[in-house]
Curated annotation (Swiss-Prot):
Annotated protein name in UniProt: Putative uncharacterized protein Rv2628
Applied relevance: Has strong T-cell and IFN-gamma inducing capacity in human tuberculin skin test positive patients, indicating this might be a good vaccine candidate.
Provenance organism: Mycobacterium tuberculosis (strain ATCC 25618 / H37Rv)
Top-rank lineage group of the source organism: Bacteria
Induction (record text): A member of the dormancy regulon. Induced in response to reduced oxygen tension (hypoxia), low levels of nitric oxide (NO) and carbon monoxide (CO). It is hoped that this regulon will give insight into the latent, or dormant phase of infection.
């Protein structure tokens, strides 16, 4: 009996069209694991951290809520509805905060009797 060396041994190049050999394995990892590793290396996921804002209602004895930017409008509108009023300035306040126009946000907040700041 003669001893034959394996035809495909060792690590092979990996790419979208790379051939993995007869057993479908590259080194110690399978083709799928190698592709997933490459995906993680070349396409990192974006981690978005939502900024939390502290909104204080000066009309209701300093009631405070800590909300993400997309909930500023609903929070302020809810407080205004308790007073029996509505205002499009709640949307403008949220927009000013979202784009970082703090002078406008503070001025709109004065009209709505609301203070807003980045929560610490």
């Amino acid at each position: 009996m003669s001893t034959q060396r394996p035809r495909h041994s060792g690590i092979r190049a990996v790419g979208p069209y790379a051939w993995a050999g007869r057993c479908g394995r590259i080194g110690r990892w399978g083709v799928h694991q190698e592709a997933m590793m490459n995906l993680a290396i070349w396409h990192p996921r974006k981690v978005q951290s939502a900024t939390i804002y502290q909104v204080t209602d000066r009309s209701h004895d300093g009631r405070t809520a800590r909300v993400p930017g997309d909930e500023i409008t609903s929070t302020v509108s809810g407080w205004l509805s308790e007073l029996g009023t509505q205002s499009p300035l709640a949307d403008e306040l949220a927009r000013a905060v979202r784009i970082g126009d703090w002078p406008a946000a503070y001025a709109i907040g004065e009209h709505l009797s609301v203070e807003i700041a980045v929560a610490v």
